[in-house]
C-alpha cells in the first residue's frame, strides 16, 4: 500500500524546499523528493542556488574581491601587507564548506518541520500519483492530493562549444578551477558570465567576454548598463558585443574559439572557456505522458497567475515556469502555492521582483526601467544621485556608480529604482519595499535616513526627482 500525503514537492531547490516547509507549517502532511548528489556523493538539498549557483559564486566573488582589495586598495588605508598571493585550492575549499553548511542547514529545517524526505528521482504519473526512483533503481509510488513541481533548471549547451568540464566548462565547472587561468574566455555577457568573469579577472586572468547580442545587459536600465560596461571594462573585462561563436577546437589543454563579429571571422585562444548563455528548465522525464500537464515549445510548464497547471491540484514553480529564473522568485512562489493549497488567498506581485548582478560594483533594479516606461508612453521624472557625492562611500573608497529613482510625472508614484554601486542589492530592496506600499518620491524624500550611510543616496535620488537634492547640483526640470 503506497504512502499518502497532502502535498508532494518534486525538487528541493529554493522553490521546492521552501514550499515543503511552508506546507508543513500550515498543517499539511508533506513529502519532498530530491535526487541531486553533492561532491561527497550524498543527497544535497538546496538545488542549483545553494550547491552550484548563487551561494558558491558569491563565496568566490567575496574571496576574489578581498584579494583585489589587498593587492590594490590596502595601501590607500596605510596598510602594508608585503607580497599578496592567492591560494586557489584553499579558496575553493572555503566555498565548498559554505555550501556544506547551508545544505546541511536546509536538511535540518526539513527534518525539524516534519517533512518526509525521499532521495531519488520524482516523476508525476496520472491521477496525481508520484513515482520515486532511488539511485539503486528501486521505485515506489506515492499518493497525494497536491503536487508541486519544482525541478529547476540547468545550463544551456550550445553546439559550437561542447562542454567537457575541463577546458570548456559551464557555470558549475567554473566554480572549481584549481588555478587561475592565464587567458579566460566567457561566452555570454549575462549575470553568470559577468560574475564568474569578474572572479577570475580579479585574481589575474585576462578575461574576454563574447556576447552575441549587440546591446550590453538589455534588460537593465540603459543608464545603469552603460555605466556598468564602462566600469567593468576598466576593471579588465574585454567585452565584445555582436560576437557570435561559431566553433571551438581543444588542443593541448587550450581552446581556440572561432567567432563572427561586424568585422568578419575571427579566432582567439584561451586556457579555459566558460559557456554561460543561459539556463533551460529541467522537465525531461519529470512527467509521464498521461500526467496531463502541458509544456510549451521550450519545455516550460504552463501555469496560471497562481502557478496552477492544467491539472487540478498540480502546481509548478521556479525555473520550470514563466518569468525570471531567480531563487527568490521561486521561493515566494513556493510560499504562495502552499498558502493556496491550505485554503488561503495568497498572491504574488510579479512587478516587484528585485534583480541583482553581484559584480563590483553591484548592479540591481526593481520595477520598470526608464526605456521601458518611455516605450509605454508614460511621462516620468527621474532623480539620480552619484556615490561620488556620498560621504559614506568616500570613507569606504567605493564611489563608483549611482542610485536612480523613476517616478510617474503625474502622481509622483515611484515606478522603478535602479542602482549600480556599493551594496546595491541591499539598497534596491528599500526601493522595493517603498514601491510595494505605493510610495511617492516625495514620501521617500521626507523620510529620515541615517547619516552617514549608503542609503542616503536613495534619499537624495528621491529628492532629485523633483529637483530638490541637497548634496548634488540639481538638473533643471
From Swiss-Prot:
Active-site positions on this chain: 451 (proton acceptor)
Compartment list: Cytoplasm
Keyword Oxidoreductase: yes
Residues the record lists as binding FAD: 34-49, 58, 122, 319, 327
Family annotation (InterPro entries): Class-I_Pyr_Nuc-Dis_Oxidored, FAD/NAD-bd_sf, FAD/NAD-binding_dom, FAD/NAD-linked_Rdtase_dimer_sf, Lipoamide_DH, Pyr_nuc-diS_OxRdtase, Pyr_nucl-diS_OxRdtase_dimer, Pyr_OxRdtase_I_AS
GO biological process, one term: 2-oxoglutarate metabolic process
Catalyzed reactions: N(6)-[(R)-dihydrolipoyl]-L-lysyl-[protein] + NAD(+) = N(6)-[(R)-lipoyl]-L-lysyl-[protein] + NADH + H(+)
Binding site for NAD(+): 188-192, 211, 245, 276-279
Record function comment: The pyruvate dehydrogenase complex catalyzes the overall conversion of pyruvate to acetyl-CoA and CO(2). It contains multiple copies of three enzymatic components: pyruvate dehydrogenase (E1), dihydrolipoamide acetyltransferase (E2) and lipoamide dehydrogenase (E3).
NCBIfam families: lipoamide_DH
Subunit structure: Homodimer.
Record's protein name: Dihydrolipoyl dehydrogenase
Organism listed in the record: Azotobacter vinelandii
Amino acid at each position: 500500500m503506497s504512502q499518502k500525503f497532502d502535498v508532494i514537492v518534486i525538487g528541493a531547490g529554493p522553490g521546492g524546499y521552501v514550499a515543503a516547509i511552508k506546507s508543513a507549517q500550515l498543517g499539511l502532511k508533506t513529502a519532498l523528493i530530491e535526487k541531486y548528489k553533492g561532491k561527497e556523493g550524498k543527497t544535497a538539498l538546496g538545488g542549483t542556488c545553494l550547491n552550484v549557483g548563487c551561494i558558491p559564486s558569491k563565496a568566490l566573488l567575496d574571496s576574489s574581491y578581498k584579494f583585489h582589495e589587498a593587492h590594490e586598495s590596502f595601501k590607500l588605508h596605510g596598510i602594508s601587507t608585503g607580497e599578496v598571493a592567492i591560494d586557489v585550492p584553499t579558496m575553493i575549499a572555503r566555498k565548498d564548506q559554505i555550501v556544506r553548511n547551508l545544505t546541511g542547514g536546509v536538511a535540518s529545517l526539513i527534518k525539524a518541520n516534519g517533512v518526509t524526505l525521499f532521495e531519488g528521482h520524482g516523476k508525476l504519473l496520472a491521477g496525481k500519483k508520484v513515482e520515486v526512483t532511488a539511485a539503486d533503481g528501486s521505485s515506489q509510488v506515492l499518493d497525494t492530493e497536491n503536487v508541486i513541481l519544482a525541478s529547476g533548471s540547468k545550463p544551456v549547451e550550445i553546439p559550437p562549444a561542447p562542454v567537457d568540464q575541463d577546458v570548456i566548462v559551464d557555470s558549475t565547472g567554473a566554480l572549481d578551477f584549481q588555478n587561475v587561468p592565464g587567458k579566460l574566455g566567457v561566452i555570454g555577457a549575462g549575470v553568470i558570465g559577468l560574475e564568474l568573469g569578474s572572479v577570475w579577472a580579479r585574481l589575474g586572468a585576462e578575461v574576454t567576454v563574447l556576447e552575441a547580442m549587440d546591446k550590453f545587459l538589455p534588460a537593465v536600465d540603459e543608464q545603469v548598463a552603460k555605466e556598468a560596461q564602462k566600469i567593468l571594462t576598466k576593471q579588465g573585462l574585454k567585452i565584445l558585443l555582436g560576437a557570435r561563436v561559431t566553433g571551438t577546437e581543444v588542443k593541448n589543454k587550450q581552446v581556440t574559439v572561432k567567432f563572427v563579429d561586424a568585422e568578419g571571422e575571427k579566432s582567439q585562444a584561451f586556457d579555459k572557456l566558460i559557456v554561460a548563455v543561459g539556463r533551460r528548465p529541467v522537465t525531461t522525464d519529470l512527467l509521464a505522458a498521461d500526467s496531463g500537464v502541458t509544456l510549451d515549445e521550450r519545455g516550460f510548464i504552463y501555469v496560471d497567475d497562481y502557478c496552477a497547471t492544467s491539472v487540478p491540484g498540480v502546481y509548478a514553480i521556479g525555473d520550470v515556469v514563466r518569468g525570471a529564473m531567480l531563487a527568490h522568485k521561486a521561493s515566494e512562489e513556493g510560499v504562495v502555492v502552499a498558502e493556496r493549497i491550505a485554503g488561503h488567498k495568497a498572491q504574488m506581485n510579479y512587478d516587484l521582483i528585485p534583480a541583482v548582478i553581484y559584480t563590483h560594483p553591484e548592479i540591481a533594479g526593481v520595477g520598470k526601467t526608464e526605456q521601458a516606461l518611455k516605450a509605454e508612453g508614460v511621462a516620468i521624472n527621474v532623480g539620480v544621485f552619484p556615490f561620488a557625492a556620498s560621504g559614506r562611500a568616500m570613507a569606504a573608497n567605493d564611489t563608483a556608480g549611482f542610485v536612480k529613482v523613476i517616478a510617474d510625472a503625474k502622481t509622483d508614484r515611484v515606478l522603478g529604482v535602479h542602482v549600480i554601486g556599493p551594496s546595491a542589492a541591499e539598497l534596491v530592496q528599500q526601493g522595493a519595499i517603498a514601491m510595494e506600499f505605493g510610495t511617492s518620491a516625495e514620501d521617500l524624500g521626507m523620510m529620515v535616513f541615517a547619516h552617514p550611510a549608503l542609503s542616503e543616496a536613495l534619499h537624495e535620488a528621491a529628492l532629485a526627482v523633483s529637483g530638490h537634492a541637497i548634496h548634488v547640483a540639481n538638473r533643471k526640470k
